[in-house]
Amino acid sequence: TCALPIFQVADSLSALILHYHIESGYENHQKLVFSPNTATQFNQLQHDRHDTPMETYPWKKVEIPSAELGNRGVLFAGIGWYTRLEFPYLNDIMEQGEYVHIEKAGLRIYPEYGTYSGYNTLPDSIFLYIADENNVVTDAVKDYLGKQVQGGKLVKDDVFLGNTYYYFDVTQFMKDELGTSGKYKHNLQLVFNSDDYTKTLRNLTFSDTKGQHPITLQLNYKIYESY
């Protein structure tokens, strides 16, 4: 394992002081003061995929199925990872009647227990954007007024940690997607906010539909028949 040393400088009065001594016939104690630059600076970020499920994949512009990651989805700021969510079987509910109307749709995403801690904390919000078949973002999942980008609500369970989840109301998206096919279908991109991607190493791991705490889409819908 490798350590990632991080510290913050509150103001220009902070300093890193190196104390040392020079060997000679008498005591010769010295110190070297490193005065910090309080401006934000980025040098380089590298990551090693050796001995991981991602080892065989190219480094850029590649889609990795969740099945190849142990049935997991991963978000990782700094290196730009996000997760695409698809709903290939949504239209199957149309077979249940002549007309189907979605009343409500809720998406729950369960962070994998053990991948976060008091130090590597869960973000208060994550976000969903709507993208076409070429992963071009066309819109965002918004609040019930249709104005603000909806941040997934973090619901914590401090007793049964596996019950901690993010909740999204995706009713309008599912209504729009029902009955579409081919190039008219869309997916959802699960992401952090832009500041997290450019300024942090925040990360999130969660299960797909086959994981220990699977991602869940709950649909409430009505079926109509003509007699």
Each language-model region and where it sits:
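Secreted, disulfide-rich extracellular signaling modules
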Residues: 1-227
